[in-house]
C-alpha cells in the first residue's frame, strides 16, 4: 500500500484499496521556486597617493601607438634616470591594480576586473621592470572629428575637421579656429591666436527629446598640444546614458573648469568618477603622458627612446593644471614620509636620508589606512608572506574566498567566481562565503568540505560574524573581521578573549577553569544543566546519535506513550531537522530526511496493518458483520489522523529548508554542483515518501468513515421526520434533538469533526476530508433514490417531502458545525432531484421536457427521464407526451447512466504555504517540555556510554541561588 512506485511527474502512485467505492487520490507535484540574484563586483583598496585608474567594467585594450611614440603600460611607466620617479605608479599598482590586465586573465570570470588584493605580489613587482618597445601599428585612416565651439561662436553647433593619426591637438585647434572664423584676421597658424584656445575632451549627458535643454559637460579634460585626438577618441567609449565630444574653449576657462572638477574628485576620495582614470589612460596612450617628477637624487627625467626629443621639447605643453596638482600632492606626500622617517628611534643621532628610493616604497606600503566605509579582513597569519596582503576589502555584499580554478570542461560551466584568491594547498576553489549587508550581523558560510574555524571552533554551517571575530581558512590563513560601519555597536570584547583577563586566581578552582574563556568547571556544568532543563526549542545531537534519537521520537509517537500535544512529534522532529540544517555538515540534512521519512512510513504501515487485522474485509461464513459505530471508528482512526497531521506540518517545514538550500546555492553560484544535485535528489525522495504517508493515511481514514456511513445513509430516504409528537429541531440543535433516523449519520460527521479538531489536522485537509464524505453521501443517496423508483411506487409527493425535510435538517446541522458551504456544494445534485419530486402534481403536469431541462440542468437527460417516467401520477395514469425527450436527446436518454460514479471525486491537494510549527520562543507546553528534557538526557546518557567508566558522571544539576 505504501509502495515506492512513482509517476513520471515525481508523485507517488498507490495501488487501489479494496473499497466499496473507487478511490483514487492524486497529489500534484510541488515544485520549489528557485530564487537568486547575483551581485556585481567593483571596488578597490583606498590609496591617497595613487594616480593610476582602476579598470572599468568593460575594459578596452588601448590601440598600438604611432611609430614615433613609445607606449608603455600605465602600471609600468618609469621615468628614465631615476627610480623614484615611478614610485607613485608602483604604489598605485599595489593598491589599485594596473591597467594592463588582471590576475584572472581573459578566460577567468571577471579577469579584467580583478583587484590588487587578488594578485600575486611578484606580478606587481614585475611591472616595474623595463619592457621591450611594442611593435608599431599599421597606419590609421583619416577621420572626421566634430569640434563644438561651446558658445564661442554663433551659428552651427560644431565644425567637422579632418584629422589623421599624426594630427595634434594644437593643429586641430588652429584648423577649427579658421573654420569658426575666430582667427581675427590673422592666419590660422598664428601662435598667439592658437595659444588662447584649447581642445577639450568633454563628457556629459545629452539632451532628451526635442527642446530637452542644452548639452552640459560634467567632466572635462584639456588635451595637451602634442596629444593626438584621433587616437584619444579610440581609447574608450562613454557608458550608456553619457555622450562624449571634443570642445573648443578658451584656454584659461578650460584650465579653471578642469581644476575645479579635479578638486571635486579629490574630495570624493576613493569613490571619484572613473573620468579621472580614463584621463590618465588617454594621456598615456595618445603621446601626452605626464612623467613623474624626479625624486631626490634622481636624474633630470629626460625621456629616451624613439620620439624622446619631441616629447622633451613639448613636455611643458603636455602637462595640464590637474597634472601639476598631482605633482604637488606627491611632493607633499614625500615630505610626510620623510617626516615619518625622522621620527623613528635614533633619528636625532643619525640623518635618516635613504639613499635608495625604493625605501620610500617600502615605507609607503606600511602606511596603510583601513577603509572607513566598507567591511574588511585583517590578515593575522598567511601562507606566503611575499604574496599575501594585510587588508582584504569586501567590495560586494557577498565576498567569496577561494583558490579559483579553470572552467569546467563538462557543459562549459564557468569557473567559480572568487573575490579574494588564497593560494594555500588546502584552500578549495570556493572555500567560504561572507555576506555583509547594510545591517549587521554579517553571515559566514563554509563550502562543502572546506575547513573553516570561527573563533577557534570548527564551522560546519552558516553562522553570524561580528567585528573582531577570528576566521580561520584551512591550516594557514587567519583573519580578523572588521566593520567600520558599525560605529562601535558590536560587542565590547571579542568572544574569543578570556572572560576575566588579568584577574587574580580566585582559589583552587582556578586550576580547573578553561584558559580560553575563563569559565570554571562549575560554571560550565551549570550552563549544561541549564540546557538540559531549559525551555529553549533546541535539540543538539551528534551524527552518531541521530538514528537512536529519531527512532525514539517515532516510537513514542506510534505507541501514544505520554501526553504529548497533537503536533508534538512533528515539533521534535523539526528540531532535529533544524539542528542538522544549522550546525552539521552540508550533506547531513538529505541523509537525515531520508531516514526520518522511512521511519515514519514504517510506523504508519504497522498501524494500518493493526487496524486491518481488527476490521477484516471478508468475515468468516456464518459470522455476521458488525457495523462500526462512530465511537469505534474514532478510536481506530485516531493514530492515523495524528500521523497525517504531523506529517503534513513536517512536510511543509522540510520544504522550507530545502528551498533555503536551493536559494543559498543559487546565490553562491553552485546550482550546477554535482554534490548539490545529489543532495536535492535525496531530498526529493524524502519528500515523496512524506507525500505517500499523507495520502495513505487520508485514504485509510476516508475508507473507514465511508464504510460506517454506508450503513447509516439509507435512513435519510426511509425515516419519517413527522412522527407523532415530534417537533422539528431548529438550526444549531444538538445531536440528541435530531430525529432518530438522522442521528447515526450525523454521529459519524460529528465524530470525524471532533477527531480532526483534537488532532489539529490542517484546515485544508479537514475541508477535503469532509468534502469526500459529502461526495460519497450524495452519490450513495442519489443512486439509492434512482434504484428504488424502478420496481415499486416510490416517486410520490408525500415521500419526496419527507426526504426533503430530512435533507434540510442535515444541512442545517452541518451549517451549525461550520461545514454548511461544503455540504451545500456536494449535496446539490441530490437536492435538485428531491426538489423535482416535491413539485405538486398539477404543476408538474403542465411542464414540458424543455422547461424541466432548463429548471434542473444538473440532472443528466437519463436521470431526468428516469424520474419522470416512474413518477406516480395515479392509478392507470402514465407520463404525458410533453415529458418525452426530443429525438436529438433520445440517444443520450437511452445510453446514459442514471447512477453517479464514485470515481469522479475531487483529487487530494496537499496544503501549500508555511508550516504551523513554531520553533521560536520558549516551549510553553509542559508535556512537550518534559519530553524534550527526556530526549536531552537520553542523548547525554548515550554520550557518557562512550567514555571510560572512570570518566562517566551523571547529568549536572543547576545550583539554586
From Swiss-Prot:
> Where are the compositionally biased (Pro residues) regions?
59-68
Query: What cellular component terms from Gene Ontology apply here?
Result: cell-cell junction; Golgi apparatus; Golgi stack; perinuclear region of cytoplasm; protein-containing complex
- Drop me one GO molecular function for this one: small GTPase binding
Identify the taxonomic lineage of the organism of origin. Answer: Eukaryota, Metazoa, Chordata, Craniata, Vertebrata
Residues modified as Phosphoserine: 274, 286, 320, 322, 325, 413
Q: What is the protein's name according to its record?
A: Ras-interacting protein 1
Spell out the CDD domains in the cross-references.
FHA_RAIN, Myo5p-like_CBD_Rasip1
Bias type Low complexity, positions = 41-57, 284-295, 314-327
Query: One GO BP annotation here?
Result: vasculogenesis
Record's compositionally biased regions (Basic and acidic residues): 1-10
Q: Which Pfam families match?
A: DIL (PF01843), RA (PF00788)
Tell me the segments the record calls region Disordered. 1-21, 35-70, 96-116, 261-352
What role is this protein assigned? Required for the proper formation of vascular structures that develop via both vasculogenesis and angiogenesis. Acts as a critical and vascular-specific regulator of GTPase signaling, cell architecture, and adhesion, which is essential for endothelial cell morphogenesis and blood vessel tubulogenesis. Regulates the activity of Rho GTPases in part by recruiting ARHGAP29 and suppressing RhoA signaling and dampening ROCK and MYH9 activities in endothelial cells. May act as effector for Golgi-bound HRAS and other Ras-like proteins. May promote HRAS-mediated transformation.
Amino acid at each position: 500500500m505504501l509502495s515506492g512506485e512513482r509517476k513520471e511527474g515525481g508523485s507517488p502512485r498507490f495501488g487501489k484499496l479494496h473499497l466499496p467505492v473507487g478511490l483514487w487520490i492524486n497529489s500534484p507535484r510541488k515544485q520549489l521556486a528557485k530564487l537568486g540574484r547575483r551581485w556585481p563586483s567593483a571596488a578597490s583598496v583606498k590609496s591617497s597617493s595613487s594616480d593610476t585608474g582602476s579598470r572599468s567594467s568593460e575594459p578596452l585594450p588601448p590601440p598600438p601607438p604611432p611609430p614615433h611614440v613609445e607606449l608603455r603600460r600605465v602600471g609600468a611607466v618609469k621615468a628614465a634616470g631615476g627610480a623614484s620617479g615611478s614610485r607613485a605608479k608602483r604604489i598605485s599598482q599595489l593598491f589599485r591594480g594596473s591597467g594592463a590586465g588582471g590576475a584572472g586573465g581573459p578566460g577567468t570570470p571577471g579577469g579584467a576586473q580583478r583587484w590588487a588584493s587578488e594578485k600575486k605580489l611578484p606580478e606587481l613587482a614585475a611591472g616595474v621592470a623595463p619592457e621591450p618597445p611594442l611593435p608599431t601599428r599599421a597606419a590609421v585612416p583619416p577621420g572626421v572629428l566634430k569640434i563644438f565651439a561651446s558658445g564661442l561662436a554663433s551659428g552651427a553647433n560644431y565644425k567637422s575637421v579632418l584629422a589623421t593619426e599624426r594630427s595634434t591637438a594644437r593643429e586641430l585647434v588652429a584648423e577649427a579656429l579658421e573654420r569658426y572664423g575666430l582667427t581675427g584676421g590673422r592666419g590660422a597658424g598664428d601662435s598667439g591666436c592658437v595659444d588662447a584656445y584649447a581642445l577639450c575632451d568633454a563628457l556629459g549627458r545629452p539632451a532628451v527629446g526635442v527642446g530637452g535643454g542644452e548639452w552640459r559637460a560634467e567632466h572635462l579634460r584639456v588635451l595637451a598640444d602634442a596629444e593626438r585626438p584621433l587616437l584619444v577618441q579610440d581609447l574608450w567609449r562613454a557608458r550608456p546614458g553619457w555622450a562624449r565630444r571634443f570642445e573648443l574653449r578658451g584656454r584659461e576657462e578650460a584650465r579653471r573648469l578642469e581644476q575645479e572638477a579635479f578638486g571635486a574628485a579629490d574630495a570624493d576620495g576613493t569613490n571619484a568618477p572613473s573620468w579621472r582614470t580614463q584621463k590618465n589612460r588617454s594621456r598615456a596612450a595618445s603621446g601626452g603622458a605626464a612623467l613623474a617628477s624626479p625624486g631626490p637624487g634622481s636624474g633630470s627625467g629626460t625621456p629616451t627612446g624613439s620620439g624622446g626629443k619631441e616629447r622633451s621639447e613639448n613636455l611643458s605643453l603636455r602637462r595640464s593644471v590637474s597634472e601639476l596638482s598631482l605633482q604637488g600632492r606627491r611632493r607633499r606626500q614625500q615630505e610626510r614620509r620623510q617626516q615619518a622617517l625622522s621620527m623613528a628611534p635614533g633619528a636625532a643621532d643619525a640623518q635618516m636620508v635613504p639613499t635608495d628610493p625604493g625605501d620610500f616604497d617600502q615605507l609607503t606600503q606600511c602606511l596603510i589606512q583601513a577603509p572607513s566605509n566598507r567591511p574588511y579582513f585583517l590578515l593575522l597569519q598567511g601562507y606566503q608572506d611575499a604574496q599575501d596582503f594585510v587588508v582584504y576589502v569586501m567590495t560586494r555584499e557577498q565576498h567569496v574566498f577561494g583558490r579559483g580554478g579553470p572552467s569546467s570542461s563538462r557543459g562549459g560551466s564557468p569557473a567559480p567566481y572568487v573575490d579574494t584568491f588564497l593560494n594555500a594547498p588546502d584552500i578549495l576553489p570556493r572555500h567560504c562565503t561572507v555576506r555583509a549587508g547594510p545591517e549587521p550581523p554579517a553571515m559566514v558560510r563554509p563550502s562543502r568540505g572546506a575547513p573553516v574555524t570561527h573563533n577557534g571552533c570548527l564551522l560546519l554551517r552558516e553562522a553570524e560574524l561580528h567585528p573582531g571575530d577570528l576566521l580561520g581558512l584551512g591550516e594557514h590563513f587567519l583573519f580578523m573581521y572588521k566593520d567600520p560601519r558599525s560605529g562601535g555597536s558590536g560587542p565590547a570584547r571579542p568572544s574569543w578573549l578570556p572572560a576575566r583577563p588579568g584577574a587574580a586566581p580566585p582559589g583552587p578552582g582556578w586550576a580547573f577553569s578553561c584558559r580560553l574563556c575563563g569559565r570554571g568547571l562549575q560554571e560550565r556544568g551549570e550552563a549544561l544543566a541549564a540546557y538540559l532543563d531549559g525551555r529553549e526549542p533546541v535539540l543538539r545531537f551528534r551524527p552518531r546519535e541521530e538514528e537512536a534519537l529519531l527512532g525514539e521520537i517515532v516510537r513514542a509517537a506510534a505507541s501514544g506513550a505520554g501526553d504529548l500535544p497533537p503536533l508534538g512529534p512533528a515539533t521534535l522532529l523539526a528540531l532535529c531537522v533544524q539542528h542538522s540544517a544549522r550546525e552539521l555538515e552540508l550533506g547531513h540534512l538529505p541523509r537525515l530526511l531520508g531516514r526520518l521519512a522511512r521511519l515514519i512510513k514504517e510506523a504508519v504501515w504497522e498501524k494500518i496493518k493493526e487496524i486491518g487485522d481488527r476490521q477484516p474485509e471478508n468475515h468468516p461464513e456464518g459470522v455476521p458483520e458488525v457495523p462500526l459505530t462512530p465511537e469505534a471508528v474514532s478510536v481506530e482512526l485516531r493514530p492515523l489522523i495524528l500521523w497525517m497531521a504531523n506529517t503534513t506540518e513536517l512536510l511543509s517545514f522540510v520544504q522550507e529548508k530545502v528551498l533555503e538550500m536551493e536559494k543559498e546555492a543559487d546565490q553562491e553560484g553552485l546550482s550546477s554542483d554535482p554534490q548539490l544535485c545529489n543532495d536535492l535528489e535525496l531530498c526529493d525522495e524524502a519528500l515523496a515518501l512524506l507525500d505517500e504517508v499523507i495520502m495513505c493515511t487520508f485514504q485509510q481514514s476516508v475508507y473507514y468513515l465511508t464504510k460506517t456511513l454506508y450503513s447509516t445513509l439509507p435512513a435519510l430516504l426511509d425515516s419519517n421526520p413527522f412522527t407523532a409528537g415530534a417537533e422539528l429541531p431548529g438550526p444549531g440543535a444538538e445531536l440528541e434533538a435530531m430525529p432518530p433516523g438522522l442521528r447515526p449519520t450525523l454521529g459519524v460527521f460529528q465524530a470525524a469533526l471532533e477527531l480532526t479538531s483534537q488532532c489539529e489536522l490542517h484546515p485544508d485537509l479537514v475541508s477535503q476530508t469532509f468534502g469526500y464524505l459529502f461526495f460519497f453521501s450524495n452519490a450513495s443517496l442519489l443512486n439509492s433514490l434512482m434504484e428504488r423508483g424502478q420496481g415499486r411506487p416510490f416517486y410520490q409527493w408525500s415521500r419526496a417531502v419527507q426526504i426533503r425535510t430530512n435533507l434540510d435538517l442535515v444541512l442545517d446541522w452541518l451549517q451549525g458545525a461550520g461545514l454548511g458551504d461544503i455540504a451545500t456544494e456536494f449535496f446539490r445534485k441530490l437536492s435538485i432531484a428531491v426538489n423535482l419530486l416535491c413539485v405538486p402534481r398539477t404543476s408538474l403536469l403542465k411542464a414540458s421536457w424543455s422547461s424541466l431541462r432548463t429548471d434542473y440542468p444538473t440532472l443528466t437527460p437519463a436521470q431526468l427521464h428516469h424520474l419522470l417516467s416512474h413518477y406516480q401520477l395515479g392509478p392507470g395514469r402514465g407520463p404525458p407526451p410533453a415529458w418525452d425527450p426530443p429525438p436529438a436527446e433520445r440517444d443520450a436518454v437511452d445510453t446514459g447512466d442514471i447512477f453517479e460514479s464514485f470515481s469522479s471525486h475531487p483529487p487530494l491537494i496537499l496544503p501549500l504555504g508555511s508550516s504551523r510549527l513554531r520553533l521560536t520562543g520558549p516551549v510553553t507546553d509542559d508535556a512537550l517540555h518534559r519530553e524534550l528534557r527526556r530526549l536531552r538526557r537520553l542523548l547525554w546518557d548515550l554520550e557518557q556510554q562512550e567514555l571510560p567508566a572512570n570518566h562517566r558522571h551523571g547529568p549536572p544539576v543547576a545550583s539554586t541561588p
